[in-house]
A protein has these predicted regions:
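Sec-dependent N-terminal signal peptides of Gram-positive bacterial secreted proteins and lipoproteins
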Residues: 1-12
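Generic detector of short, well-ordered, non-transmembrane alpha-helical segments enriched
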Residues: 9-11, 35, 86, 115
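Histidine (H) residue identity feature
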Residues: 10, 37, 54-55, 135, ...
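Glycine-rich catalytic cores of cysteine/serine-nucleophile enzymes that process amide/ester linkages
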Residues: 17-77, 100-110
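Intrinsically disordered, low-complexity, charged/polar segments
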Residues: 59-80, 84-88, 142-157, 163-167
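Active-site nucleophile-His-acid catalytic modules used for acyl/amide transfer and hydrolysis
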Residues: 74-135
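Activation targets extended, charge/polar-rich intrinsically disordered C-terminal tails
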Residues: 110-167
């Protein structure tokens, strides 16, 4: 099921159709030294994220996300079944779970978690390791930066595309 949201941003109103697995990245916040913030669209008009102030993963409406974080870009895997699997994993591993917020190395360990790790791990469990370049070599990151999901080179290399590329 797709959701159509009318988003009003900088006096422009545009319609955006969200699909499961869409990665929302905002620059409207920063926490624990990480600039930016991520959420993953899980279907039915809902986004899953974990903000520092809330301490545990939470679910909110896309409408509330856009209101809270007006400067948001959206990326999507070119393979829609991968997006579906990742969204289902976000629900399975994080929705309603009392996993404390903390930025720690190794995104495969989710005893503690943070916003971009939730997105990374959900895709990892769907069979996709989102890689970033380190000294010219593409590797899984030790700490996942929120902006990795909107860096043009990273997005392209990992088989994602921009659905909304405007802050």
């Amino acid at each position: 099921a797709m959701i159509l949201a009318i988003v009003s941003n900088h006096n422009q109103t545009f319609a955006l159709t969200y699909k499961k697995g869409d990665v929302l990245t905002t620059r409207s916040t920063s926490a624990s030294g990480l600039t930016g913030h991520n959420g993953i669209y899980i279907g039915n008009g809902k986004v899953l994220d974990t903000p520092r102030v809330h301490h545990y993963p939470r679910v909110m409406s896309v409408k509330k996300w856009i209101k809270s974080y007006p400067k948001t870009k959206v990326t999507r895997p070119k393979n829609s079944s991968l997006g579906n699997k990742a969204a289902n994993n976000a629900v399975k591993y994080f929705k309603g779970k009392k996993i404390p917020y903390k930025v720690t190395p190794n995104p495969k360990n989710i005893k503690k978690t943070y916003c971009s790790e939730i997105v990374w791990y959900s895709y990892y469990k769907a069979g996709k390791q989102y890689m970033i370049p380190e000294h010219g070599v593409w590797l899984p990151p030790s700490i996942v930066a929120p902006y990795a999901f909107v860096n043009k080179q990273d997005v392209k290399h990992n088989g994602f595309k921009f659905v909304d590329n405007k802050w």
